[in-house]
Amino acid sequence: MTYNEKIISMNNDLLDHQHKELFEISKKLSLMNQRHVGTKELKIVLRELLIMINRHFSDEEAFMREIGYPYINHHTRIHRKIILEIEEIIISEAKFVNIMTEKLNLVVQDFIFKHTAKEDSKIVKYYEEKFKK
């Protein structure tokens, strides 16, 4: 599966680029799970994931405020839930690297594909209705 087959455009170059970066991190996690990596290598990718996802959510929430998106509070709660889910996996599976990478990969892929298709598409629809008439 390629990035362009599944990810919608947010009409925002920064957010679109970040979605692509998160997709690349997801690919790294998937490969790490197949290769049975050590904790040192995993920590590097986990750090990259947490930094990128927090930055992306912050930027996306700023975009929603900028366009006056009426459901920003709901969307922000979903973001917090995703972050908590990732953190919970890291804590609960710290001793089992392969299980951790597998679970994280599923959460990240779910976020990238399902969240963008379902939730982010609502932002896109609102943006297009409000600004692209």
From Swiss-Prot:
Fe cation 1 binds at H19, H56, E60, D120. Fe cation 2 binds at E60, H75, H79, H115, D120. Transmembrane segments: none annotated. Disulfide bonds: none annotated. Pfam families: Hemerythrin (PF01814). InterPro entries: Bacteriohemerythrin-like, Haemerythrin_Fe_BS, Hemerythrin, Hemerythrin-like, Hemerythrin-like_sf, Hemerythrin_metal-bd. SUPFAM superfamilies: Hemerythrin-like. GO terms for molecular function: iron ion binding; oxygen carrier activity. The keyword Cell division does not apply. The keyword Iron-sulfur does not apply. Monomer. Oxygen-binding protein. May be involved in a storage mechanism or for delivery to oxygen-requiring enzymes. The oxygen-binding site contains two iron atoms. Belongs to the hemerythrin family. This is Bacteriohemerythrin. It comes from Campylobacter jejuni subsp. jejuni serotype O:23/36 (strain 81-176).
